[in-house]
């Protein structure tokens, strides 16, 4: 039977509960246990698919097409286990399910209440499908005290009593701020956070204390005394120089040992952390450096590109180089020459996005990369802008544009109205809802033999990658574009939807309609990112 670890947060938001959960999952996995990680989000949205990147950050898409919290990206990258739509739930989804069942009459006329109906739905989600796992780690979004989170805290309180004794523990992530004028770490915010938890019936078993310095023995004793935890269960979560050092840092602090002790499990052997050690050696001792320009729309909110940042880091690990990122707001190119911003970089990446704002700047970035022979990687929207650039400046279609921006006489990019998922036809219309209506999740693509991209994928002729888009390049222009050197080297199996474009007479210029960053791992860098950084290394020797 699975054992459950509930991770909560206190004092302030953005402490890194997702990263802490992922690191703990990796440590347990390194000891030979089978783990599953799940995220419970208290907001009322059904999913983050229609939320602003500035508020929520990245939307992480799973193979089965779920739009989920970015923490699921951490879970996948640290454990290598693909997440599914069953690993993330929101208050909105729970309420939708309950109200649907109420309308059907499933509750037989009962008054629907937060307790027991909402809490029972949360518990059912947590317990579902865990039979073949040793540990299930459940992260509760937000911080203790948030009114939205109360049903979730109540549900996990009940679960500890529902499960057999010794099958559930609570890990509380908190902050120990250092006050320079006093010259000491302050424990009072943590004490109040734990007091809030205890007031709703939850006694933490382990305190995971974020800090930038060592916790003095006296402060550790004070936390143990006033928070009612063992002194050994006050874990020092020191800041790390990079996120892939966190598993080693937490192991050195004793987190995994304390978790096993809380369950009454005697550790058989220390965790196998050599792989993590090797990765950190590569990160800390690079053999060179490259600079990649990210020409985007949401550059003020780096979390909007979380998986992208990590995938570029993985490309650096694969090539033993440090990857420096130069964030450039694409709007600056609309009235400025791109050259002064891009002449110093070793590669240009234009990521996914939506809407017209900044689109012309991305088109200029693609043109600069094509004409100056700088490695270019266009992802989703970045591929579409590269195709429009080619149509305008190579083929001579001056009005080439996307219907996403409004009516156009030359729709190089248009709204998808139907596509195949397996053997089933999916249809969409412009008048439909925004949420959950894109082409989402894993789809196959067929690669042309002899193409650059096929070589990057090890000679593969069929791949599967994750998608998140509702617009697609118009194949009616395919022949004219190919006559001018832009090769369509990847298509959907039915040949209808372009998936990959490339210039073969360019050092490295590839656009993909999918999101390869979602499948990159530190131990298995995505081949496109490894190849892109390799091309940037070559470029760095030419600049």
From Swiss-Prot:
Enzyme class name: ligase
NCBIfam families, A to Z: PRK05380.1, PyrG
A GO term, aspect molecular function: ATP binding
Pathway: Pyrimidine metabolism; CTP biosynthesis via de novo pathway; CTP from UDP: step 2/2
Name of protein: CTP synthase
Residues binding Mg(2+), per UniProt: 71, 139
Active-site annotation: 380, 515, 517
Record family assignment: Belongs to the CTP synthase family.
Positions of region (Amidoligase domain): 1-265
Binding site for CTP: 13, 146-148, 186-191, 222
Something else known: CTPSs have evolved a hybrid strategy for distinguishing between UTP and CTP. The overlapping regions of the product feedback inhibitory and substrate sites recognize a common feature in both compounds, the triphosphate moiety. To differentiate isosteric substrate and product pyrimidine rings, an additional pocket far from the expected kinase/ligase catalytic site, specifically recognizes the cytosine and ribose portions of the product inhibitor.
GO annotation, biological process: 'de novo' CTP biosynthetic process; pyrimidine nucleobase biosynthetic process
Activity regulation note: Allosterically activated by GTP, when glutamine is the substrate; GTP has no effect on the reaction when ammonia is the substrate. The allosteric effector GTP functions by stabilizing the protein conformation that binds the tetrahedral intermediate(s) formed during glutamine hydrolysis. Inhibited by the product CTP, via allosteric rather than competitive inhibition.
Annotated function: Catalyzes the ATP-dependent amination of UTP to CTP with either L-glutamine or ammonia as the source of nitrogen. Regulates intracellular CTP levels through interactions with the four ribonucleotide triphosphates.
Source organism superkingdom: Bacteria
Record: residues binding L-glutamine: 54, 353, 381-384, 404, 470
Record-listed E.C. numbers: 6.3.4.2
Any single Gene Ontology cellular-component annotation: cytosol
Binding site for UTP: 13, 186-191, 222
Binding-site residues for ATP, renumbered to this chain: 14-19, 71, 238-240
Start and end residues of each Glutamine amidotransferase type-1 domain: 291-542
Keywords attached to this entry: ATP-binding, Glutamine amidotransferase, Ligase, Magnesium, Metal-binding, Nucleotide-binding, Pyrimidine biosynthesis
Catalytically driven reaction(s): UTP + L-glutamine + ATP + H2O = CTP + L-glutamate + ADP + phosphate + 2 H(+); L-glutamine + H2O = L-glutamate + NH4(+); UTP + NH4(+) + ATP = CTP + ADP + phosphate + 2 H(+)
Oligomeric and partner information: Homotetramer.
């Amino acid at each position: 039977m699975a054992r459950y670890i509930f991770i909560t947060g206190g004092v302030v938001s953005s402490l890194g509960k997702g990263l802490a959960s992922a690191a703990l999952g990796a440590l347990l996995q390194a000891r030979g246990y089978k783990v599953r990680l799940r995220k419970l989000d208290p907001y009322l949205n059904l999913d983050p698919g229609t939320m602003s990147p500035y508020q929520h950050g990245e939307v992480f898409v799973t193979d089965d097409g779920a739009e989920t919290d970015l923490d699921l990206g951490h879970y996948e990258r640290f454990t290598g286990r693909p997440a599914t739509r069953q690993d993330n739930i929101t208050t909105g989804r729970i309420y939708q399910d309950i109200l649907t069942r109420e309308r059907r009459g499933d509750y037989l006329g009962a008054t629907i209440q937060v307790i027991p109906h909402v809490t029972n739905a949360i518990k059912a989600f947590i317990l579902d499908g865990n039979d073949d796992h040793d540990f299930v780690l459940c992260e509760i979004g937000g911080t203790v005290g948030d009114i939205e989170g109360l049903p979730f805290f109540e549900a996990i309180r009940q679960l500890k009593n529902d499960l057999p004794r010794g099958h559930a523990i609570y890990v509380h992530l908190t902050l120990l701020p250092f006050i320079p004028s006093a010259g000491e770490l302050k424990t009072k915010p943590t004490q109040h956070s734990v007091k809030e938890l205890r007031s709703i019936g939850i006694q933490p078993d382990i305190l995971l204390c974020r800090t930038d310095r060592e916790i003095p023995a006296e402060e550790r004793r004070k936390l143990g005394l006033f928070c009612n935890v063992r002194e050994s269960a006050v874990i020092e979560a020191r800041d790390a120089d990079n996120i892939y050092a966190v598993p080693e840092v937490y192991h050195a602090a004793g987190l995994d040992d304390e978790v096993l002790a809380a369950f009454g499990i005697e550790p058989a052997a220390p965790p196998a952390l050599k792989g993590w050690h090797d990765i950190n050696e590569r990160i800390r001792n690079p053999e060179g450096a490259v600079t990649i320009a990210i020409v985007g729309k949401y550059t003020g909110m780096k979390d909007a590109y979380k998986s992208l940042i990590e995938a570029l880091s993985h490309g650096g690990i694969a090539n033993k180089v440090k990857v420096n990122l130069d964030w450039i707001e694409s709007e600056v190119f609309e009235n400025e020459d791109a050259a002064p911003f891009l002449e110093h970089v070793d590669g240009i990446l234009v990521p996914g996005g939506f809407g017209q704002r900044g689109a012309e700047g991305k088109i200029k970035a693609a043109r600069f990369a094509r004409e100056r022979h700088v490695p270019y990687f266009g992802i989703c929207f970045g591929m579409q802008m590269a195709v429009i650039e080619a149509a305008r400046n190579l083929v001579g279609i001056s009005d080439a544009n996307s219907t996403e921006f409004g009516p156009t006489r030359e729709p190089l990019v248009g709204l998808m109205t139907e596509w195949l998922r397996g053997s089933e036809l999916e249809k969409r219309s412009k008048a439909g809802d925004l949420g959950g209506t894109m082409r989402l999740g894993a789809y196959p693509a067929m690669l042309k033999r002899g193409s650059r991209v096929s070589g990057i994928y090890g000679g593969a002729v069929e791949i599967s990658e994750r998608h998140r888009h509702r617009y697609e390049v118009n194949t009616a222009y395919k022949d004219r574009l190919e006559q001018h050197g832009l090769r369509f080297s990847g298509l959907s199996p039915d040949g209808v939807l372009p998936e990959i474009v490339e210039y073969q007479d360019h050092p490295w210029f590839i656009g993909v309609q999918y999101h390869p960053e979602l499948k990159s791992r530190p131990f298995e860098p995505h081949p496109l990112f490894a190849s892109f950084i390799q091309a940037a290394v070559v470029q760095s020797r030419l600049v």
